[in-house]
UniProtKB/Swiss-Prot annotation:
SMART domains: Hr1, RasGEF_N_2, RICTOR_M, RICTOR_N, RICTOR_V. Component of TORC2, which regulates multiple cellular processes to control cell growth in response to environmental signals. TORC2 is required for cell survival under various stress conditions. TORC2 positively controls G1 cell-cycle arrest, sexual development and amino acid uptake. Positively regulates amino acid uptake through the control of expression of amino acid permeases. Gene3D superfamilies: HR1 repeat, Leucine-rich Repeat Variant. The keyword Glycoprotein does not apply. Either Ser-203 or Ser-204 are phosphorylated as well. It is a multi-pass membrane protein. This is Target of rapamycin complex 2 subunit ste20. The modification Phosphothreonine is found at T1203.
């Protein structure tokens, strides 16, 4: 049931009649003459009421559909009918009243008044009622957690009373609530009076106010304030907020003088919920910088500060809305005067951040974080940056909020103009203090609660440090003053008595993004390491692919690996390895020693993978450990040998488990094949074992058959399945053995009987990981039988194939349906029934198997299954488990499903084509067929399928040049896909055939102009966005999504693909674009740049880098002597992200042999593989060449010097007021606080009038805005002054003191 407003019916449209008919008034005409004039006034008043009802009804009908769109159709018709009836009734009554007035005036000889002016007259303002001074007992409630459109609601009976976006939100007040007859007379009597601060509007505003669009709402609010109806005040304010939310108009901001009296009347009530409504209303009204004029009229900073300092739960709504309004003011501030105006509020928020137990501390921290991004100068002037940093690492806020603040700090440091507000390295060193200060853990040893707080502080600091160290801005900031901050972290590992050393190790795990696995957790727990070979399970939805950005078969390191390389190199130069060894030698904690050993092993692995041999050789040799281990008389020899053995065991286990921490990408398409020497050797060993198994003698063979227990029992749980695998992979591959087994034993018959679907043995086994061995053995049985003609004959006559066919026909829609089919959805999920499809894959891999499937009409059944619309799960299973190397029914079935299946089927089948192309058994025929289907999928009606097909073809072309040539020969049309097909077309540029094809369709000319003017900058934005999203996801700041772009994949660049062909190089040279990029680099070097100039510079760097990463494009860089200039950018640029971009670009250039040579001459070393090919990573000889930055001194802003205005204000104060100022100033002194507070309390008790001085309150508020005070002190100062004084300077006369909040002048020391 919807809430009902006070004085309304449940529909808010059933308006009661206040006027009587014309006949009623004719009867009154016979009264005495003394009553005639009063009756005439009554008629005019009622006519005015009816005019307002008519106007309101007309307005409501115009916006009816908008305001009542959430109502049901029947209710809307009923409400609309009532509104129409009321409109007609009002018009009829107006006619009667006008006729009566004209007749009555005619009888008295009065001049007639035109009906138009009578019907359109507006009521004047009303005087304040005495009820304003009464205390209100209404109970308030608030809907917490609301958005920008949330409402403050009030109820006197405990019910939640609207409006919060309900059907009555925007009703015109005159239609919602009738005006009483007595109020009309009172308003008419007071219309000529000026409204003073005691509740009257100035007469000079009457004409403008009557035409103001917000007049109905403001008038209703104003009247409710005078009547003291808190519910009506809040309801009307909510209605106005709803209107402003949907009809915001900057013109309203120019009429603040019309709005201010209503706002003041609300503030004078001094009720928390009404004040919250004021803040919400102002937030909707403030649209630009003109809002600060209204702030000055209302003394808004003082009121807001008082609201923020109201620490009890009763003021929660008010504080929340105050913070929202303050954020709006921060966003709208645009001048230095605005920043100074907000300094007092900012210092109040800073003091709240310092107060750990304050309930609003979290939102105060968030506000300062937002302020650091949009207006850092305000925060700097209030000395709030250091307070904010301390609050991030004290453990009182969440890790994610601390990480978000670190991201904001990174944003601040990236801009040279805003970075000057950070005092490096001291301000940023605060964030690392929990790891470098010995008191960080010792101070919390007194209680369990404080120890938990210390642990939270460590986690928050680690999160913040990892964010900073994984960004260029943060890394450069921490490298200031010869890596002072980073060096202190590394050196803490050398201090034996330093308690948080284990936390420092955890910090390095987070910095290098070391992933834990089951075996690593076992090692850290002190358990013995066991080697478990990883059995790769093919999964099309989670297949890895290395970064192949240039379209060749070469594998290059990603941008993330490039960044990790320089980060690792810095810590190695700072002595990380030696510090870890010192910690291991001196640690008495076995757990900490194991953790340090594991970190040492990961550091060695990363240095081997990411650092050039020139830089990593010394680290890999571990001189200190080997020296300790080789000295037999040393006490630490056992420790050294134990560490070396542990590292060797870790590397061995890691190798056999085949973990690849850097190769996990979001590619859904490819799996890196194992082609290393160990895998080839393993295959050779297996081949030898297979040959030896086929040559065993008869007795050994019979013994193996007996060991399986198949001949002894039908209970499959007693069978030796490992022995069965050995027999299938060895002896039974011999024609002699299989023939003998089939003729003389029941071995194969009993084995196949186990797999019959209708026997409910294999088909009823639960689908668990250990039970997957039954599927593997079943596939081996089918493969073994197909390897021999006798086995093929036996299998074709076996009932197992027949029953599989019959089971499939149970659901094909053409046969008789059964209640519980074998291949039901539930059985596929819960049992091993899905294992029959891998067995069918074995059959479909050979011609003999095709013949068996044709005999039992399995292909016909599969054709029928593709037509099902409610079994996508089944279709997907058999499509992904058939073999398509042979031409025939399998390919036709796949093509049919690809064309006519549901969207999920088509999408999965498109992805499966990529797995087929990448499979080990793929041949040219299969690849050509798969590519032709992928081309066809480019025209699928589903956009997601098209995107997947483009992605598959793009990665296919990047992986194999022969497949790229096949795709180009088919000449697919991608015009209908727009930007989605651009990456695939860019691949075509790498070949001569593709270049000519793109030239014919004018693609090159169009893209050349598009990239030069627009796409170059878009490329920068895309790359940085992908890098950032992956960065915050890896640090678990946000949840990782499946469709999240991967920073490992470098997006294709038009110029990089263009120069891969000779014809493309000619086009680039004739266009003159490279010279333009070079001009940008030369022009912007060592100059202050704006945001657009920075983006343009980055786009030029990436364009040059992508050109220089190819053997043909590097010539352009050599001819223009580009590489030394890029090195200067990497070493000297004042903009961190530009320096990082130049560093990445040098990595691209190092992919060519000529680039490696030039970089080496400039003292930059490139990472080379064992085969002598570059890996796309280059590192300077010394880390200081790129990262070390000089100490930055921040200019101190002294705002404590009195301004002339403040000095003049002080000179006008009386002696008593000056004494108050002196005592308030002393409150900031911890020594004088208590005595000053007592003196101020004494003055207030003896001479309270002194605190009603507007001069004094202005002086005190100015002092609070210039100096730092604790929360308790600020609360105390605000409680000294009556609430009315804070509003007084916005009017021309003193205000009578309104009912103020209870004053509590006692403060704690």
């Amino acid at each position: 049931m919807k809430p009902v407003r006070r004085g309304q019916t449940d529909t808010a449209l059933d308006i009661s009649s206040h006027a009587k008919t014309n006949g009623d008034f004719i009867k009154k005409m016979n009264t005495t003459d003394s009553k005639r004039l009063k009756l005439l006034e009554d008629l005019k008043g009622k006519l005015e009421v009816e005019c307002k009802i008519r106007d309101g009804a007309e307005t409501l009908l115009q916006v009816f559909d908008t305001n009542f769109k959430k109502e049901t159709k029947e209710r809307k018709e009923m409400l609309k009918k009532k509104c129409t009836d009321e409109l007609e009734s009002s018009k009829k009554k107006i006619e009667e009243l006008v006729s009566s007035i004209e007749s009555f005036q005619g009888e008295n000889g009065e001049a007639k008044t035109g009906s138009t002016s009578l019907t359109r007259s507006a009521s004047a303002t009303v005087s304040r009622k005495s009820s304003l001074q009464e205390k209100y007992s209404t109970r308030f409630s608030y809907k917490a957690g609301c958005s920008d459109s949330c409402s403050v609601t009030v109820s006197g009976t405990g019910e939640l009373i609207g409006p919060t976006r309900n059907a009555h939100s925007n009703l015109t007040p005159t239609v919602i609530q009738r005006i009483d007859f007595e109020n009309v007379n009172e308003k008419n009597n007071s219309s000529s009076e000026d409204t003073q601060p005691n509740g009257k509007r100035p007469s000079s505003l009457q004409s403008n106010f009557s035409q103001f669009p917000l007049n109905p709402w403001l008038d209703n609010i104003y009247k409710a304030c005078l009547e003291g109806s808190m519910k009506d005040v809040i309801d009307s304010s909510n209605n106005l907020c709803e209107y402003l939310h949907e009809h915001s108009d900057p013109a309203y901001a120019k009429n603040f003088s019309l709005i201010t009296p209503t706002i003041l009347s609300m503030l004078e009530l001094n009720v928390s919920e009404v004040t919250a409504s004021v803040y919400r209303l102002l937030r909707h009204l403030f649209l630009d910088a003109t809002a600060f004029s209204c702030c000055q009229m209302l003394n808004l900073p003082w009121i807001l500060s008082k609201s923020l300092l109201s620490g009890t739960d009763a003021y929660q709504i008010e504080r929340e809305q105050a913070f929202r309004l303050i954020r709006t003011l921060y966003f709208l501030s645009s001048t230095e005067g605005h920043e100074d105006y907000l300094s007092g509020i900012t210092r109040t928020i800073i003091s709240i951040c310092e107060h750990v137990s304050d309930v609003s501390r979290g939102i105060a921290v968030e506000t300062l974080i937002e302020l650091m991004i949009i207006r850092p100068k305000i925060l700097f002037k209030a000395n709030g940056l250091r307070v904010l940093m301390i609050s991030l690492i004290d453990g009182s806020i969440s890790e994610n909020l601390a990480a978000s603040a670190a991201l904001a700090l990174v944003y601040l440091l990236d801009d040279p103009e805003s970075a000057c507000y950070v005092n490096l390295p001291y301000d940023i060193g605060i964030l690392l203090s929990p790891f470098t200060s010995s008191s960080s853990r010792d101070t919390f040893n007194s209680s369990e609660e404080q120890s938990e707080q210390a642990a939270k502080a460590m986690k928050s600091s680690a999160k913040v440090a990892s964010v900073l160290l994984n960004s260029w801005s943060g890394l450069l900031a921490l490298s200031t003053n010869d890596f002072q901050a980073l060096r202190s972290i590394v050196d803490t590992l050398r201090v034996p008595s330093f308690a948080p050393r284990s936390d420092v190790i955890d910090l390095f795990f987070l910095i290098f993004q070391v992933e834990y696995s089951s075996w690593s957790e076992s090692f850290l727990a002190g358990k013995r390491l066991t080697v478990v070979k990883n059995q790769a399970v093919s999964n099309d939805d989670n297949i890895n692919m290395v970064n192949i950005p240039d379209g060749s078969n070469k594998k290059y390191m990603s941008l993330r690996q490039h960044f990790t390389a320089v980060l690792l190199f810095i810590f190695l130069e700072l002595g990380l390895v030696e510090s870890i060894v010192c910690m291991i030698r001196a640690s008495d904690d076995p757990s900490a020693s194991r953790k340090a050993t594991y970190l040492l092993g990961e550091v060695l692995r990363l240095s081997d993978e990411l650092l050039p041999i020139h830089l990593g050789a010394k680290i890999q040799s571990l001189p200190s450990l080997f020296n300790m281990a080789s000295q037999f008389t040393a006490e630490d020899r056992f420790v050294a040998t134990s560490v070396l053995q542990s590292i060797e065991s870790l590397n061995r286990v890691k190798f056999h488990s085949a973990t690849q921490p850097f190769s996990q990408t979001t590619s859904l398409l490819f799996k890196e094949q194992k082609t290393d020497g160990s895998f080839r050797g393993q295959r050779q060993v297996e081949h030898v074992k297979l040959k030896m198994g086929m040559q065993i003698d008869d007795s050994h063979f019979r013994s193996m058959l007996a060991e399986t227990n198949v001949l002894a029992t039908k209970n499959y749980q007693k069978w030796r399945w490992d022995t069965l695998v050995q027999i299938m992979e060895g002896p039974l591959l011999s024609p002699k053995r299989i023939d003998e087994t089939l003729r003389t034993t029941k071995f194969m018959r009993r084995l196949l009987a186990f797999y019959k679907p209708f026997s409910n043995r294999f088909s009823s086994i639960q689908n668990t990981k250990p039970n997957q061995k039954f599927i593997k053995v079943g596939c081996l049985v089918f493969r073994t039988l197909l390897a021999n003609p006798e086995g093929v004959k036996y299998l074709s006559e076996s009932k197992v194939i027949k029953q599989i066919a019959e089971s499939l026909s149970q659901i094909d829609g053409y046969s008789e349906q059964v209640s519980e089919p074998i291949f039901s959805n539930s059985r596929l999920q819960k049992t091993l029934t899905h294992g029959y499809f891998p067995m069918l894959k074995v059959l479909s891999s050979q011609k003999e198997g095709h013949a068996i499937m044709e005999r039992w009409r399995i292909f016909t059944t599969l054709y029928h299954l593709t037509e099902l619309r409610n079994r996508d799960d089944l279709i997907i299973i058999f499509l992904t488990n058939l073999d398509y190397r042979l031409e025939g029914h399998t390919r036709i079935i796949f093509s049919k499903a690809l064309n006519t299946g549901q969207q999920a089927v088509r999408l999965t089948a498109t992805k499966h084509l990529a797995a087929l192309i990448n499979s080990e058994s793929a041949n040219d025929n299969l690849n050509h067929w798969a590519i032709s289907l992928l081309i066809f999928q480019l025209y699928d009606p589903c956009l997601e399928v098209c995107k997947t097909a483009v992605k598959v073809l793009n990665e296919v072309c990047a992986r194999n040049e022969n497949l790229l040539a096949q795709v180009v020969q088919l000449q697919p049309s991608l015009a209908h896909l727009g930007e989605i097909g651009s990456p695939l077309l860019l691949r075509f540029l790498a070949t001569t055939v593709g270049f000519h094809y793109l030239s014919e369709i004018n693609f090159i000319e169009h893209e050349l102009d598009n990239w030069y003017h627009h796409r170059n900058i878009d490329y920068v934005d895309l790359l940085e966005q992908n890098f950032f999203l992956s960065f915050v996801s890896n640090l678990k700041i946000i949840d990782k999504k499946n469709n999240e772009p991967d920073e490992n994949i470098l997006p294709l660049h038009f110029y990089g693909e263009l120069v891969k062909s000779p014809q493309g190089c000619e086009v680039l040279e004739s266009s003159g674009h490279f010279e333009s990029f070079m001009g940008t680099l030369v022009e912007f070097y060592d100059k202050p740049l704006g945001n657009e100039a920075i983006r343009q510079l980055k786009s030029a760097l990436w364009a040059i880098g992508n050109i220089g990463k190819t053997d043909q494009g590097i010539t352009f860089l050599i001819n223009h002597d580009t590489i030394p200039l890029i090195v200067k950018y990497a070493e000297n640029s004042l903009i961190p992200t530009v320096r990082g971009t130049a560093y990445f670009v040098l990595g691209l250039i190092s992919r060519t042999s000529k680039g490696v040579e030039i970089l080496e001459s400039l003292h930059w070393y490139s990472l080379m593989s064992l085969m002598g090919t570059s890996q796309g990573i280059c590192i300077p000889r010394h880390a200081g060449q790129v990262l070390s930055t000089p100490r930055r001194n921040v200019e101190f802003v002294n705002e404590r010097v009195p301004t002339p205005e403040f000095s003049s204000l002080l000179s006008s104060l009386t002696n008593s007021e000056r004494e108050v100022i002196r005592l308030v100033s002393n409150l900031s002194n911890h020594v004088l606080t208590n005595e000053s507070a007592r003196q101020l309390t004494k003055i207030r008790s003896k001479n309270a009038k002194v605190f009603s001085s507007k001069r004094l309150v202005k002086a005190c508020m100015t002092i609070l805005g210039k100096f730092h005070y604790r929360v308790q002190i600020q609360q105390f100062v605000f409680e000294l002054f009556p609430y009315s004084v804070l509003l007084s300077s916005s009017t021309s006369q003193d205000l009578n003191e309104s009912p103020s909040r209870p004053n509590n002048l006692s403060i704690s020391a």
